[in-house]
């Protein structure tokens, strides 16, 4: 009799266990199918000359100054290269502005000053940099005048407007090599 009770308990336990497993399996929701990725939307963004100058040149002008003030010549050289590349991108994006070819205009007005700033950076000469940068800034204003925008007046920065960037030299940091020209 004892065996019969034991067998009945085992059968009842097995049925209860099977019922709970089936219940759990039935109550677990099926995984949701993965959502399809949103389609790529290409915006009809047509930046103006002002947009590009504000995005590509003006911040680098200020960062170039800030880096040189900290005698971080590596960062200054980087910012100057980025500024040059910005002028190239602008001329490629907007080749003509009010019937003026921007590429040659940038070269004619800015090139000698950019080279002078580069020389000051290469020689790590703060006094030479200050003078060359003032001339570069004056060239910005000459370019604005040539493009009938004399009301846009650039100046040598008085303060650094980038509170989230440290312009000091970081000891032991090796700068990346200059990017290859395309």
Annotate each language-model stretch with its function.
Residues 11, 17, 39-40:
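Heptad-repeat coiled-coil amphipathic alpha-helices that mediate oligomerization/assembly
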Residues 1-14:
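Bacterial N-terminal signal peptides that target proteins for export
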Residues 15-24:
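C-terminal segment of classical bacterial N-terminal signal peptides
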Residues 31, 35-182:
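Sequence context surrounding c-type heme c attachment/ligation sites in exported
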Residues 26-28:
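Boundary of Sec targeting at the N-terminus
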């Amino acid at each position: 009799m004892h065996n019969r009770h034991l067998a009945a308990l085992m059968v009842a336990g097995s049925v209860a266990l099977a019922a709970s497993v089936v219940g759990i399996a039935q109550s677990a929701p099926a995984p949701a199918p993965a959502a399809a990725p949103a389609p790529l939307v290409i915006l009809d963004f047509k930046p103006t000359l002002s947009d590009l100058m504000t995005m590509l040149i003006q911040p680098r002008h200020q960062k170039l100054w800030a880096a040189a003030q900290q005698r971080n010549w590596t960062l200054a050289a980087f910012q100057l290269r980025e500024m040059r590349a910005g002028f190239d991108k602008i001329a490629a994006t907007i080749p003509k502005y009010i019937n003026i070819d921007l590429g040659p205009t940038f070269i004619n007005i800015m090139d000698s000053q950019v080279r002078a700033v580069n020389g000051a950076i290469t020689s790590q000469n703060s006094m030479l940099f200050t003078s060359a940068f003032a001339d570069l800034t004056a060239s910005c204003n000459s370019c604005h005048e040539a493009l009938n925008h004399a009301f846009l007046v650039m100046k040598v920065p008085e303060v650094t407007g980038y509170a989230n960037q440290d312009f000091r030299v970081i000891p032991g940091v090796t700068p990346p090599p200059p990017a290859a020209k395309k």
